[in-house]
């Protein structure tokens, strides 16, 4: 799996794009299986780095979504309310929320695509 080089990643398997969109990685959606429900915050909500901001429910489990950065939610991907399976189809295009960062330096704490790919492979036992 190729992870977009312009995204930053967390060890909890979330990504953030340069424009502040947040989603889960292909590795995460593959581990979860068929996603049937996504719970997201409302526009205007504040999220805090490392804290849960929603959840993803699959046929296997419910998993919390952890904020890679702190910020204010400026948009929510409403498509996922009716078609959560889009996360399985293309995890790196199916963003969940868009945020306005309150502390852009938090991006420096995140993993590059190459580092995340190595981390995900080690976690999977490869």
From Swiss-Prot:
| Leader sequence segment | none
> Cellular component terms, GO, for this chain's entry?
cytosol; glycine cleavage complex
- Name the InterPro entries for this protein: 2-oxoA_DH_lipoyl-BS (IPR003016), Biotin_lipoyl (IPR000089), GCV_H (IPR002930), GCV_H/Fam206 (IPR033753), GCV_H_sub (IPR017453), Single_hybrid_motif (IPR011053)
Record PTM N6-lipoyllysine, positions in chain: 60
Which PROSITE patterns does this entry report, sorted A to Z?
BIOTINYL_LIPOYL, LIPOYL
Q: How does it assemble?
A: The glycine cleavage system is composed of four proteins: P, T, L and H.
Q: What is this protein called?
A: Glycine cleavage system H protein
UniProt source species = Koribacter versatilis (strain Ellin345)
């Amino acid at each position: 799996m190729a992870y977009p080089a312009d995204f930053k990643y967390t060890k909890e398997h979330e990504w953030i794009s340069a424009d502040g969109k947040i989603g889960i990685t292909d590795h995460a959606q593959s581990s979860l299986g068929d996603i049937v429900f996504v719970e997201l915050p409302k526009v205007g909500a504040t999220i805090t780095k490392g804290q849960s901001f929603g959840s993803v429910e699959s046929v296997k489990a419910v998993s919390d979504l952890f904020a890679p950065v702190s910020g204010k939610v400026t948009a929510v991907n409403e498509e996922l309310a009716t078609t959560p399976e889009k996360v399985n189809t293309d995890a790196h295009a199916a963003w969940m929320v868009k945020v306005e960062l309150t502390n852009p330096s938090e991006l420096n704490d995140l993993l590059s695509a190459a580092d995340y790919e190595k981390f995900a492979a080690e976690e999977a036992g490869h």
